[in-house]
Amino acid sequence: MKRLHQVFVCCFAILSLMLLYNTSQALLFDFEKADQINQWKDLAGKMEIKDGLFCSTSAAGGPLVSMIKDWKDEWSDYTITTKAQGLIGDGDWGIAFRVQDIANHYSWQFCNGSLMFITYVGGGRVESVIQGQGEVLEEWQEYKVDVKGNKFDLYFNGKLLKSVTHDALETGSVGTFSWINAGLVVGAHGGAALDDFNVEGKGIPSSKLSVESKNKLAVTWAGLKK
């Protein structure tokens, strides 16, 4: 019985180390600290951290595109997940990837009530609408994109809804995309709010937040904030 207990403890320790390793290879943003904004760059509009949320607050109207600053082109395969909620009708809200500039990026988002994969290449915009996925505002939803080379698996609320390939943009950072129409009055958290933004993939270094999660016995990041 004693040996069985030792084997159990050993297996538990190994499993814990594996969880720690997997957790460490990720950029994690819980937006609980205001200085996390310094790791992001606004390409259009203005994003702010308010009440532990990443919020699109620009009142000028138009797109709000923000990306992680210190992104390396060799990080080509990765998975992005984030919680998000739209706070206004007739707006955009979601995530962006392969972000090079305001005229060149991909996004997985709601736009005017429809869930879409949108490409911006050389300033030209092409929409691919996901049928049958209605927009729900002011409730937390989950976006996920699994990026492998030029193939993108697009998930929403845990379900794979579409797999697409696109060759135009081979590199670029990851971030957020939203849109607020000019003159629209928004609340304290703006047109959209995001939380628990996570990018995990080969070569991506651990962030400070993932180190903190190690001290919490490798509880998964999704379970840290509910």
Where are the model-predicted features located?
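Bacterial N-terminal signal peptides
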Residues: V9-L20
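Short, aromatic/His-centered strand-loop micro-motif at the edge of beta-sheets
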Residues: V121-K144
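Short carbohydrate-recognition loop motifs
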Residues: G45-L64
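Flexible glycan-contacting loops in extracellular carbohydrate-active proteins
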Residues: V164-D195
